[in-house]
Amino acid sequence: MSGYGMSVNDTTIWWQVYPLGFTGAPIRPSNEGERALTPRLDAIIPWLDYLIDMGANGLLLGPVFASETHGYDTVDYYRIDSRLGDDAAFDRLIDACRSRGIRVMLDGVFNHVGRSFPAFRDALAGHGHESMFHITRNAGGGVDYRRFEGHPELPELNHDSEEVVRLVTDGMLH
């Protein structure tokens, strides 16, 4: 078909890596805070040549943003999970991919967040951001919310909310 170029997905063979598991990160972030950073993302770099040897030319990274446990319970879309390192570690991985001609795709978890997500905590307390979630309050003061696949630690985002549209857009452009 003339006039139509091939898309990235037509020309990319992806190798998927779940960084928290692949790098042996602890199940939960350290209580010691940011000072305890270990640049575990660096452990992926030596595997990039293997990716190419397998015939792949794209790295699909599972969740890399700050989360409470498994990466799919995001608490901050603008910070690399401290168990994986920091922005500098992420930049080194991206630079190593670029130098080898490897495309990178991130797994953006925008269907739900973790219970410690600041806007969710505010919404539960009645301090704003309620429209971002499917929250119901009963007459007795109880609060309920829609959960991803029934998991209470994964509050669903309300994609009809303008705040959520901005959150997702800003997160993808960050």
Model-derived segments and spans:
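Substrate-binding/active-site clefts of carbohydrate-active enzymes
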Residues: 3-14, 18-57, 64-174
